[in-house]
Amino acid sequence: AVGPDIRLMIDAFHWYSRTDALALGRGLEKLGFDWIEEPMDEQSMSSYKWLADNLDIPVVGPESAAGKHWHRAEWLKAGACDILRTGVNDVGGITPALKTMHLAEAFGVECEVHGNTAMNLHVVAATKNCRWYERGLLHPFLEYDDGHDYLKSLSDPMDSDGYVHVPDRPGLGEDIDFNFIENNRVR
């Protein structure tokens, strides 16, 4: 259990039907969750509009729907989400992710970035309408404080207060282990 000072969100990862997503969302509202993310298949934008219209808790999406950043404009126009989702790997790069952030800002909507990485950290730092940085994945088989083998250190270490800072190294700030890359090239 956690206290009231801990913010809770849920990523339901497409598991629910419309009626089950509604029941889940209403339960989460009673528990004080901040949002419900992608509870249904994202191919049905009308289902998301229906859900957003019927819940008080913000509905977040789309995360993995096709259409890169252009499709997210349709979601905003339709009112299919209360908080827009983007990410460098989801929409085709840093520039499309920033375009998505600015699109949401033009609609007066928060836009949250999906996943960590140095690229996503820079997108979050460059915008005003993103409140959270999704660092790590709480999973029984993954350790989010372990970096990639090709890096000498984490791209996004968390400080003792729970904050992540943009690194001051050149470029995206990644500390690349070029010896590892050289020793693991396919020849």
What do these predicted ranges mean?
Residues 1-49, 54:
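Metal-dependent enolase-superfamily TIM-barrel catalytic cores that perform enediolate-based chemistry
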Residues 18, 42-45, 94, 114, ...:
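Electropositive phosphate-/nucleotide-binding environments in soluble metabolic enzymes
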Residues 148-187:
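C-terminal extensions of enzymes
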